[in-house]
Amino acid sequence: MGVSSMFRGENACSFTALGLFSPAVVIALFLSGCTSESTTPELSDSDLPEQATWDEVIRKAQGKTVHIGMWDGDPMINAYIRDWVAPPLLKEHGITLQQIGSQGAATVSRLMVDLESGRSTGDFDLVWINGENFFQLRKMQALYGPFTDRLPNSRYIDWKNPFIAMDFQQRVDGYECPWGNVQQAIICNSEHVPDPPRTLDQLAAWIHQHPGRFTFDNGFTGMTFLKSLLYEFAGGRDSLNGPFDEARYLAASAKLWAWLREIQPHLWRQGETFPENVAQLHQLFSNDEVDFTMSNNDGEVDNKVLQGVLPEHAKAFVLESGSIRNSHYLGIPVNAANKAAAMVVVNFLISPEAQLQKAMPAVWGDGTVLSTELLPEEWKNKLEHIDGRTRVPPRSELERSALMEPAPEIMIRLNEDFRREIIERAR
């Protein structure tokens, strides 16, 4: 499949300062029933008739500029977009891809301001969406769609896979397209920990025997780790699926806080403080201050070793009780100026070629959203055997212990309750 086929397929309330809030607070505001009182802006001339063919989409995309709002904090991800994605888009369709640094609450805030003001053409044509942001944007009616069924390369995606079709327990329904799929992994110093703990009991025992050598961050990655543990205390796999259940959460979290309080004195700095984010945790690990770090991307360990962020002896694994697996997505704002061009970009990004390139640890190490069972044999073999993935088990093995993202309310509660039950009690 050449570059052309990658694009075409084989057949041709007012929160204008929202960015000041954390994602958890933003979700809480929406869950409390507070949404923008403004109406969705009138659709612009850039909107496509539902019956438009893919060839018509391609023609409308010619020569346009697509502004993609995405996190720009990783030089290797930026290089993938700049050096590998942008050139063929420009050559094939004259599409100029411009990256705008924006993520999370900042993106939601900018889109909300647009909606409140009735601005028909916004700053973004495409946005990188993670979990809770999709929940917020759907509540705001800020996303264009459904559009994924119009993408030729979407035929390689298994839309029955709940890790694709559901985003934080909410159906995507064609309003965002999966771009990458990852699973949280714990990373250990294989020289100090040649046989890492595989169960919660074994982990607790290891922490007691090696005081000060384990911790987790106080940010998104650490809270995702706690979500994975919460499943075990709630009854195991599938126990937290479905809408938020207050009683179930309280029962499971009480066991989680008891487990954490029991190991807390044996954590790094006696559990009185925690790294603010996973970057700080990686630094502690690299400085040999702790023997474990972690990542929400199972493929990141190889990528970060190549970057020199993590040492050569870093190895990744998953507890037998499982870990959170999720997808990150691309969405088109309802007021995007160039929706057709954005669709062409998304179709390219989910092509087998682009997904394989992105999965390479030397490029990004981001897992594919394509189902190998739906791919031609050539691509099936390539995506099942990623060059350079040597420090983490195969994705097919990790999938057996994958846990779905629970309802977004759980992330809010864990953020709040962890501070009250663990951090403040230690002071």
Where are the model-predicted features located?
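N-terminal secretory signal peptides that target proteins for export/translocation
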Residues: 1-15
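C-terminal motif of bacterial Sec signal peptides marking the signal peptidase cleavage site
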Residues: 32-33
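Early extracytoplasmic/lumenal segment of secretory-pathway proteins
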Residues: 37, 46-132
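Conserved C-terminal helix/tail region of periplasmic/extracytoplasmic solute-binding proteins
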Residues: 50-52, 283, 390-427
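Extracytoplasmic ligand-binding site segments that recognize negatively charged/polar headgroups
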Residues: 71-84, 98-108, 124-280
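Extracytoplasmic/periplasmic substrate-binding proteins
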Residues: 268-335, 380-381
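Mature extracytoplasmic/periplasmic domains
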Residues: 323-324, 328-398
